[in-house]
Amino acid sequence: MEFASPEQRRLETIRSHIDTSPTNDQSSSLFLNATASSASPFFKEDSYSVVLPEKLDTGKWNVYRSKRSPTKLVSRFPDHPEIGTLHDNFVHAVETYAENKYLGTRVRSDGTIGEYSWMTYGEAASERQAIGSGLLFHGVNQGDCVGLYFINRPEWLVVDHACAAYSFVSVPLYDTLGPDAVKFVVNHANLQAIFCVPQTLNILLSFLAEIPSIRLIVVVGGADEHLPSLPRGTGVTIVSYQKLLSQGRSSLHPFSPPKPEDIATICYTSGTTGTPKGVVLTHGNLIANVAGSSVEAEFFPSDVYISYLPLAHIYERANQIMGVYGGVAVGFYQGDVFKLMDDFAVLRPTIFCSVPRLYNRIYDGITSAVKSSGVVKKRLFEIAYNSKKQAIINGRTPSAFWDKLVFNKIKEKLGGRVRFMGSGASPLSPDVMDFLRICFGCSVREGYGMTETSCVISAMDDGDNLSGHVGSPNPACEVKLVDVPEMNYTSDDQPYPRGEICVRGPIIFKGYYKDEEQTREILDGDGWLHTGDIGLWLPGGRLKIIDRKKNIFKLAQGEYIAPEKIENVYTKCRFVSQCFIHGDSFNSSLVAIVSVDPEVMKDWAASEGIKYEHLGQLCNDPRVRKTVLAEMDDLGREAQLRGFEFAKAVTLVPEPFTLENGLLTPTFKIKRPQAKAYFAEAISKMYAEIAASNPIPSKL
Amino acid sequence: MPVFKAPFNGYSVKFSPFYESRLAVATAQNFGILGNGRIHVLELAPGAPGVTESVSYDTADAVYDVCWSESHDSVLIAAIGDGSVKIYDTALPPPSNPIRSFQEHAREVQSVDYNPTRRDSFLTSSWDDTVKLWAMDRPASVRTFKEHAYCVYQAVWNPKHGDVFASASGDCTLRIWDVREPGSTMIIPAHDFEILSCDWNKYDDCILATSSVDKTVKVWDVRSYRVPLAVLNGHGYAVRKVKFSPHRRSLIASCSYDMSVCLWDYMVEDALVGRYDHHTEFAVGIDMSVLVEGLMASTGWDELVYVWQQGMDPRAS
């Protein structure tokens, strides 16, 4: 064998000592029965999904299901079909794992940070009975809505379990919500009681008179003597969590378990415009979703989960339900994302579910640490990275040698035990996914879902090493793509069928709370939920998200952008005759392509004494670009655009967008996909400029 | 028991044949993949748990093996990753060292062994697929043995016959040579996977042990080499070095990528008589003292050198 360098030869020689050893694992002699699978009409080789006809009479085969449950959608855990509600799920966990660690926090009662201290499943169970009984004691009735308005900590889950056990409806509120949104949600859901922390209590008290439905405010982490006393006649009681516990303990009530079809929670989503929408989810919805996911990804009592994503988000909520089912120990972060790495080192979790934003930070941190580690270490890293990547691509088991040499030290940064990484909420770039798989040597899987589907619609299957897609349907739902002719997406598209992603099954929500109109817009008569996302089917029945149906997209940090609104602002600028705003979920900022007004440009250049031969040259002049962008910024501020709605770079083009050059519709709207392709080079150049002017942080 | 922490990853450890308290250690930076090397000469403090370094020598590339001269108590020879073989005299001041350097091997030199009976020559084996014979008084190698088809990981002199040696190679063969003959005298396809190490029995000049990537140690009799005398199973990964005891006829020590050091009695049915899990990285170097019965030394990628008495815990101090 010939190698490019001595170090590669040495690495390969030693690696072969370790990897070519005969295996003791006898399982390799077991092969799947190929005949059985090819005999079934459902299965295709190397497929993750099966395709079925939507209606027997029309015979169009366009509905995809997971191959793990092709004939019946999963609605209960296969091993425990008796679990129909969140209450059943928790009771099952308490009976099975009573003595196991469940909820852990490192924040002590005096606010200092230490080792994790744990509450067992059994202890959490008796605490949730006390909390539920305490709520009854204060006159909260079955079916009433109870708000949770604080960040992740053990009490959050105890209260949530209390709601399930006594048939209250839990309504989570992001701790970051402003007063207006909180006021809206409290009134819209007619909340009777709300749990908060001292910080969020002050927000509530600032508009107490405007939320008349509230009868009880419970302060978590506050001492009774420090709680404000309210004037008589307000009808509102403020108690500490501790006091509610003792009140409940002294008047324990038996559970009033919900039925699977009862409402478990109302999750308010921010939406792009207007007021929050309340997504109504039943116990059956949530159990179905988690049961479906559990077919492909199992959690075990030996697992340790780190909870830091907001519990008000369906992604974290669903993970918690899965954790309870598996008897997992859940450790909470100390409340500060910047100290998350410290929490990792102490907790040493085995399961880590996060969002691309954090994975991107980890990626940036490691790559820049490698760059600054010196020539030798950098070279070692590169060799190890490429070798392991090749092994994974070629379907071989990568050498343990590379892990020992390079990657175990990186893995230690997350505590060293992570075996499963999940990513959701926005797309993870394939580069970063490959990087995580190689550096952390664990299963890294991306999922796709939304609150309206109780979380997961599709997720990558175990052992699927292709990145850049969101996997096959959750066994608890079926998925089809519906043609969107106005955007040129059809089922006949080559090479892959495309269309709007529609979902049906036991995971679909009951509707938006008190909003039938919006419910009808998203949920059709046949029970299909229209997601508004455009997808395509990759070979093997794996879904890839490629666009949004409405001209709305998400930036990398998760903010929604309605580009037309921003374009309308910028076209007010004197230099701008037409404007195309571009952004996507791999970048955290917007860029603009501006077709300039030639007359204004000429006059301005003359007044500034700038010489030029033709308009194109003027457009490329950095001074001109800077001036135009500065004026655009002024207009943006005037129109009160939010920070992420500002274009961070601009490219000026002399020619207008027209019907003839294919950039406009007959109604003079910008054809976005075409414009994106047409200006692809300019767009990537602008992002490169932005990246160059904002060096990435060098530390995690 | 004495422990020494080296700045680099350990590759080999050898007891001096002249002083019971002296050892030489071969080490390499970055696991011997890339970077410098260093040779340490260590002294065990009598009756105390300490180890002191009497001298160390830096090299420009990894040091994979080291051996003591059998004729001069202060001389040692090092096998270097850049293909060179260097001779050091610890009696001379550091600037005079190395006293010799031979640049003949085209690739990494993996082992060096001093002739214990003639005491005037030594062998080196290399990843250039050759074994070379050297004499202390010659300016270049005396002879090159080129038959193996892949890296030669170790070449060891027979303890009785000063002209006979064995070589272990990644081509899955063990070869026996007599330097008076033009080619190898015996080829034993000893394992189905790479052979990483071999050693002669000190009491029976016809018996050898080999260790391999196949995780086993095998014991062979050259008079009937069709089947091994014993196959020793117990390591979880490739066995990097194997060594016969100088004091007990049937005792063998081995160390492995599974991070353990094992002791075997190949004559008894339950051959595994001891296992030491003191290393936290690949254990790649092992030796047994000729002068003190039962005294063992090991080193590994955890940068630690342990010296301990058989049957004791290497970590206990």
Swiss-Prot record, chain A:
GO annotation, cellular component aspect: peroxisome; plastid
Pathway: Lipid metabolism; fatty acid metabolism
Region (Disordered): 1-29
Keyword vocabulary terms for this entry: ATP-binding, Fatty acid metabolism, Ligase, Lipid metabolism, Magnesium, Nucleotide-binding, Peroxisome
Cofactor(s) the protein requires to work: Mg(2+)
Subunit structure: Interacts with PEX5.
Protein's name in the database: Long chain acyl-CoA synthetase 7, peroxisomal
Lineage: Eukaryota, Viridiplantae, Streptophyta, Embryophyta, Tracheophyta
Gene expressing this chain: LACS7
Swiss-Prot record, chain B:
Disruption phenotype: No visible phenotype, but reduced sensitivity to indole-3-butyric acid (IBA) and inefficient peroxisomal import of PTS2-containing proteins.
One MF annotation (Gene Ontology) recorded for this entry: peroxisome matrix targeting signal-2 binding
Alphabetical list of SMART domains matching this protein: WD40
Keywords, in A-Z order: Cytoplasm, Peroxisome, Peroxisome biogenesis, Protein transport, Receptor, Repeat, Transport, WD repeat
Subcellular localization(s) per the UniProt record: Cytoplasm, Cytosol; Peroxisome matrix
A Pfam entry, by short name: WD40
SUPFAM superfamilies assigned to the protein according to its UniProt record, in alphabetical order: WD40 repeat-like
Presence of the UniProt keyword Acetylation in the record: no
Start-end of each WD repeat: 58-98, 104-144, 147-187, 190-230, 234-274, 278-317
Recorded superkingdom: Eukaryota
Gene Ontology CC: Cul4-RING E3 ubiquitin ligase complex; cytosol; peroxisomal matrix
GO biological process, one term: protein targeting to peroxisome
Tissues of expression: Expressed in siliques and leaves, but barely detectable in flowers, stems and roots.
Main location: cytoplasm
Comment, domains: The WD40 repeats are involved in the binding of PTS2-containing proteins.
Reported function: Receptor required for the peroxisomal import of proteins containing a C-terminal PTS2-type peroxisomal targeting signal. Specifically binds to cargo proteins containing a PTS2 peroxisomal targeting signal in the cytosol. Cargo protein-binding triggers interaction with PEX5 and formation of a ternary complex composed of PEX5 and PEX7 along with PTS2-containing cargo proteins, which is tranlocated into peroxisomes by passing through the PEX13-PEX14 docking complex.
Note, other: The binding of a cargo to PEX7 is necessary but not sufficient for the targeting of the complex to the peroxisome. PEX12, PEX13 and PEX14 play a critical role in this targeting. PEX7 is required for PEX5 stability in light-grown seedlings.
PANTHER family linked: PEROXISOMAL TARGETING SIGNAL 2 RECEPTOR
Subunit record text: Interacts with PEX5; interaction only takes place when PEX7 is associated with cargo proteins. Interacts with PEX13 (via N-terminus) and PEX12 (via C-terminus), but not with PEX14.
Protein family per UniProt: Belongs to the WD repeat peroxin-7 family.
Protein name: Peroxisome biogenesis protein 7
Organism field: Arabidopsis thaliana (Mouse-ear cress)
